[in-house]
Amino acid sequence: MVNSKWSSMKNILFILSIFLCVEGFSQEAFAFFTQNGKRTSYRKLLRKSKKADIVLFGEYHNNPIAHWLEVKLTKDLLGKRSLILGAEMFERDNQDALDGYLQGTIDQKGLDTLARLWKNYKTDYKPWVDLAKREKLPIVATNIPRKYANLVYKKGLQALDTLPSAERKWIVSLPFPYDGNLSQYEKMKKMARHNPENLPMAQAIKDATMAESIETHYKKGSLFLHLNGSYHSDFFQGIYWYLRKRNPNLKILTISTLSQSSLKKLSSEAYGQADFILVVDEDMTGSY
């Protein structure tokens, strides 16, 4: 009990320290920019988010400021319209366990046992999930189970044809469109030490599955806020590209996270990366 209280106190102190930075410390911890490199604000991001159908919040998985802003944005969107949440961090076949936790039929220990939680879940995602639980918000487990993405990486997309029908519900409906010439997938080919053609395919099946999950659960008039790694939606590709393929009429807003040594201006390489780009001081400590 003492350790739990101390952990909560540390979280509160950390959040307060961020507020102090925002309220006037000379050394800023983060800044927002538009895709054209113009300095902007959280207030404008919030205003634009309220008008979107879908918001893709691209994060650095170990960045505490991104995680804090995810919670803040969720809170600020409460009550405006029907709010639906979704996250890369939960895989489709863990939906029942996640629902059980949100509905109170299983506790945290049960969720730990039944779901494949990320190693940084308790520090980085539990506050967001618990907010959803308190506010009775649904969270959609959007991602493909990792073992199927690994199968694509090792053997290519054709390996999915061997899956039994009972397992195909965990992945995007086949066949799905794939464009290996998209710039983000091209970068992955260059980064790959092994199977350079298969690596972007494994990424694409994640992107396509998450997009299908989002579009399937989105309801007209609602707002869907989705958390994912920045690479999954940067430069209006990945999840964004697949959502556009599925429904070109959706109003989609993208957020990306970036680390820089200076917050004075946006790096030219990041122009066009997202509608709003969260730039964090590169000296910011990571959660792992």
Task: Describe the role of every protein-language-model region.
Residues T209, E215-Y218, H232-Y288:
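C-terminal regions of proteins
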